[in-house]
A protein has these predicted regions:
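Short, flexible loop/turn elements at secondary-structure junctions
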Residues: 82, 110-112, 140, 176-178, ...
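Alpha-helical membrane-targeting segments
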Residues: 1-27, 228-254, 328-341
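Soluble, non-transmembrane catalytic domains of enzymes that act on hydrophobic metabolites at membranes
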Residues: 30-55, 59-61, 75-79, 172-180, ...
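Flexible mid-to-C-terminal extensions adjoining Fe-S/redox cofactors in radical SAM and related proteins
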Residues: 27, 259, 276-341
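Radical SAM enzyme [4Fe-4S]-AdoMet core and its adjacent flexible, acidic
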Residues: 128-278, 282-288, 292
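Cys/His-rich zinc-coordinating "finger/knuckle" motifs
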Residues: 46, 50-54, 269, 287, ...
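Conserved alpha-helical substructure of the radical SAM core
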Residues: 3-131, 331
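Residue-level signal for well-ordered alpha-helical positions
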Residues: 46-49, 121, 148-151, 292, ...
Length: 341
């Protein structure tokens, strides 16, 4: 990630902190968009692939929904389902780069089942002079990963995509979802765990569309093992290191306590495939971009009521790395304390 991008993200977070101290309500600077429920994986911890996509957001609806907030957006995260299955991807990137003058990062999460297409998507973003970040979902060694993801040969396609991205110097990393299914792999691994630079753990509902049976004792121990081997190679890795440390404390508190305040709806919003706009994937919709634009929804009574709930810690409590970096940056002192505590 380029230095000017890092400085821009630091700037917008400082600006948000100052505005909040003045009791002002800045617009979110990050939008996460789940473009589709369509998915070609068959993950054992997620049932989204069983959903038959219907009434999903269109490029036209996205275009209309951004009216009035274009200059507030610094960071876009695209996911699914599987992003590489979205037909209007190039049109979307053109729209974002042409209209959001402060846009610095476009992030994609992918299962890598179509490595050539995903690589072309990533290269297209890079050619727009925007920092891209591609997270390649990888949950273990070949046997473990392909079993979890339900598709034979998926592991090798992850390796193909990573090699192509590395050769073109496109920012990317392996991201692991910790569960009881890859517990044995994690606990029997050592330095190999250093390759994982994005770390989350299984949840229920939200984009998982499934109630997962809790195996938090195993997940907690696996997270500790990953933290022990985590290597900070780049400046942005510090955020992930803090994320993992707080995730461990979150799990130690049985997922019932936010270790630092959640900042969703202030720094970020989440748009679902059906157009529902949410603070995060686990909370109620505050509006729908098929019916109203983002700015109008942000100005609504329901948004302000939901912000109060979040401020008072009345949220589902998830500590997912979709949202945690922004909570960390909006609570720098408490986050640094957690880093050394």
């Amino acid at each position: 990630m380029r230095l000017k991008t890092i400085l821009s993200i630091i700037y917008i977070n400082l600006k948000h902190n100052i505005l909040k101290l003045q009791n002002k309500n800045p617009n979110p600077y990050k939008i996460l968009i789940n473009l589709t429920d369509l998915c070609n994986s068959r993950c054992n911890f997620c049932d989204i692939w069983k959903i038959k996509p219907k009434n999903e957001i269109t490029m036209s609806e996205i275009r209309k929904s951004f009216k009035g907030i274009e200059n507030d957006i610094y960071w876009i995260a695209l996911s699914g389902g599987e992003v590489s299955l979205v037909k209007y991807f190039y049109e979307l990137i053109d729209f974002l780069t042409q209209n959001c003058k402060n846009l610095k990062i476009i992030a994609i999460t992918t299962n890598s089942l179509t490595p050539n297409r995903t690589f072309e998507f990533a290269r297209y973003i890079k050619n727009k002079n925007i920092d891209s970040h591609i997270t390649i979902s990888l949950d273990g060694d070949e046997k473990t990963h392909d079993k979890i993801r339900g598709v034979s040969g998926n592991f090798k396609k992850c390796e193909i995509l990573k090699k192509k991205l590395d050769e073109q110097k496109i920012n990317n990393c392996y991201g692991i979802t910790v569960s009881d299914a890859n517990y044995d792999y994690i606990m029997s691994s050592g330095n190999e765990l250093k390759k994982f630079k994005a770390v989350t753990f299984v949840h229920s509902e939200g984009i998982y569309a499934k109630e997962n049976i809790s195996a938090d004792e195993k997940i907690l121990n696996a997270m500790k093992k990953i933290l022990y081997h985590f290597k900070i190679d780049k400046l942005q890795d510090i955020l992930e290191y803090i994320h993992i440390k707080i995730a461990i404390k979150f799990l130690e508190h049985k997922r019932k306590k936010n270790i630092i305040k959640c900042d969703v709806l202030n720094s970020s919003i989440h748009i679902m495939p059906n157009g529902d706009m949410k603070p995060c994937m686990f909370m109620e919709s505050i509006g729908n971009i098929k019916l109203e634009n983002i700015q109008k929804i942000l100005n609504s009574k329901k948004t302000f009521e939901t912000k109060k709930l979040i401020k008072n810690d009345n949220c589902p409590k998830c500590w997912m790395n979709c949202y945690s970096p922004h909570s960390i940056m909006q609570n720098p002192i408490k986050s640094i304390y957690q880093l050394f505590n």
